[in-house]
């Protein structure tokens, strides 16, 4: 049918035939039923009229037969599809618009399916405009309608089953990436859409990680002539060219390219757009595809088409009709009828109506295919194919694009004929390689897409060109290759400008001549089956004779790999950070010398040891001793948080600071190097080279060394040529591949593996667990390199050498080495951060503890052996006194008493109720003072266990500091004979008391210096004992002992104690006897321990104030007093311990100090008879005498009870507090507190108590105090200080009270802490 070009449409007979055909086809719909009606026509289905419009004379023959075929192919429930085929002859846009508008105005249709073969780019905008104007869905299935040049009209339902320019470019760039064709040039004319084409290329290349090299865009003028076009095409050097132009413009472009030599096999052209692909023929092999001018298309042309590009016309049109039918079915389901659409192009625009109907045609599924469209009207997931023009000028499908995934056949390159023979191409190289990590790594292609991942290139197995494969033989398997050498190959192709086909050699060898035939990569190049061979190919003399090698790009040689063997940790590993000389210097020299130096500085310091002795501030000895100095320095070395005592001298402090700095450096250096010695020492064999005796004489070792290599390589060639005996031995241990050799090394079946150094270094760095190591930290023997093998005299050798040298100069080779040849394992560094220390690592420390425990057990056994066995074998000798004194003196240098806590303010005193006093029993006979030497020797002579009960318990505190040395001559109350002392005085008889458990305390004894001239008594001013013989008295003076007691046990429950006269030993002297009328009573057992006693002779501020207030006269009303367990919780009595202490023998040697000498109750002198200023103190309790009492004449004796006449005026300040009988005893109970010094003044209604003033002085000071008058000299039994209860409330001593000698009655059996001065003792 021939269409007219006027607006009135067809005329004459043609018009009548068209109207008759339309009437017979009955395209006009029947009366539309109401909503919900189903069916229509004869079958009850609604009629759906779809116009099939074909533009071009090629469709005239098939158009009449399409209607029934399409109606049968597209069946939709509830619709009667009635396709109407129309053919338009006009090809220009104006004629096309007029014909379509006349057709739509004369027919009542529901949709249009359009196809043309004109490839006119203006068709798509016309169809888009008509759809927006009439609201009709228009589906373009083929031809130039597959290109939209302008944005879609608003409300348009113009849909395209073809692919857009952007989608075609996306597929083309996937192909370029797959084959590493990164350099390209864009060639275009000024055809409609060329700007969009260039913009799409910029979008795809900018920001991509592939590294595209867009070498420019050429905009050609097809009418400029072939010479000008050829010059423009040659101006840009690129093998890959992307062409976008109209069909009639392609002929001059390809003719100019062919004249310029740019259409050969070395160049690849990609056609973009629907203008050229599939044109000029049916695609049947053998039928040439010609351009409009009759010129054939060049071989190797690629294009991207829709997957149905080879489908027949009926199937293509049926797909478009199905889209319209499925959308109409959705409309009918929602509305119940098919809406009336516009049929006149000249009517008012129906954009608002088209927007509401547009969504029903966007998501369609038909024939198991998805026809979902995007906003531009193209398919979201189009099915595309990549077609290539073969040498026979036929289109071949080489790839497909489904669901955004590309699948390509291999090989894609159209270089192979019927028998896979490559065509001649000067710019295309066939490259052979061999898999060997990390230089060439072969992986399978992606099983889903069949493509290679980024940074890898396709490679294949070797082709068999000897025999022709069968027609149905599969193509070579596609593989993906990557690695160090592959990256170099890609850079060479990019720099020099060639394409390549990569394949793997079949025999898997580098190259060796066997029976006169070369195999491997060298054989492929030598026999010219490959243009180039790249990989871990070592350059050697034999290979260089038949092929040419490029400059080496990797330095290598021969190396030896072994496996690390697990070693053991030495038990002395914890001592290995320092040498034995350092340990000896540290602990034998440095620690001892510095400790002694610090002690000497502290001893000579004005505020340290010596100063304390000189001033008497610390008469008990220094608190910083040699032992504490060593302990302090030891704690500083090892950062032990132990209690230490710091020196007070500035010089010693500086020494300690310097030692602390030294200790930090010492300990930090030790800990920093300890981890390296605590790990297991791994053993690695070392060899000097291939000529080492271990390789040349392996049988001489036991077991023999097992080593091998991979045969048919340069390593084996080197060994075979230079060490034939070694080669003959290692043949039995050769391995087929490197990976198998490494497995044998780890399993212990192979001791060493000899191979290329570059490969072994990589394997060692990448080994899991870092168990493999190359000997000598990667030491290389027979150094050489890797090169690229080429034909002899190849023209590619010089460009490749220059390119490799450029890579070396630009550090690209070094960058690739860091990328591919590096790893986490290093030969010279063993990473052990994650390894755990087990019992083997710490065995040495445990062994040291076991040895220390064994030595402790030996010392423990020796201690008990000496104490229970050997000490009784010692004969009676006076040398033991020297050993005893020496041990005590040494102990005094290593121990000291801790300083007491700070004092607290005292609470107010509490009154004491008056107890009842039973009659006192008569005192025992006087006990003379026992010399220290005699007492110690006598104790050693006595057998074990002769003392009273409790003696062993008393000695426990002594043994705590002195070990198996017995405290001798301490007045322990043992039953013993009365030997004569040095002064002729007998020893004190033991006092029989019931066994008592002594408190947990301790004591110590030292000798004091003897006076140069013996006084009349033990001390001046005190009564003398019975006179010894004159010779003995003149020869030996009375030795003095010191003793102090501190109660360490918790105080007994508070209760009102009962005092016992014998529990209060008072100082006295002379040979006076007891009063005849003194009552006697057996001392009962006390439940609570009695207080301790000490002498306190320092002046008191309160005493000074009292003296000044009375004008220096004696304070007759101020009477110090004391009582056992009196609950005065004065915390400030917790001061430093007293400096002068006296033993039991010294206190008990004066019989006048016994309570048995107290006068009868109610006697004239009963009221206040004290020997000293005595006071009651809570635990620890002390007996003290103040200096004020001495100055005030407190020892002025009252007349004895048997003396006649009134008693003289006494200057003694003594008295007792007035009790409060009305208070219950429970109200006076108070917890034991610190010792206090209490004084009180007698007042009219009671007693007031001045503030406490603790003092301390020795008994020598007491005896040397000034006296008020000669008449006050103490004489007779009345010279003893007596306990003085108040006359109105105090009676005789309580019968329940016990002696002050110890808890059970003997003060000597009490244990206490020793406070004494070793520098004043005779050691």
Curated annotation (Swiss-Prot):
Residues 899-929, 987-1001, 1080-1092 have a biased composition (Pro residues). One of its GO terms (biological process) is monoatomic cation transmembrane transport. It holds the Pfam family ANF_receptor. L-glutamate binds at residues 536, 538, 543, 714-715, 756. It is found in: Cell membrane; Postsynaptic cell membrane. Residues 1-27 form the signal peptide. A motif (PDZ-binding) lies at residues 1321-1323. InterPro entries: ANF_lig-bd_rcpt (IPR001828), Glu/Gly-bd (IPR019594), Iono_Glu_rcpt_met (IPR001508), Ionotropic_Glu_rcpt (IPR015683), Iontro_rcpt_C (IPR001320), Peripla_BP_I (IPR028082). Residues 602-626, 639-650, 865-1323 are cytoplasmic. Glycans are attached at residues 89, 349, 363, 381, 464, 566, 712. Keywords: Calcium, Cell membrane, Disulfide bond, Glycoprotein, Ion channel, Ion transport, Ligand-gated ion channel, Magnesium, Membrane, Methylation, Phosphoprotein, Postsynaptic cell membrane, Receptor, Signal, Synapse, Transmembrane, Transmembrane helix, Transport. Its main location: membrane. One of its GO terms (cellular component) is hippocampal mossy fiber to CA3 synapse. This is Glutamate receptor ionotropic, NMDA 2D. The gene is Grin2d.
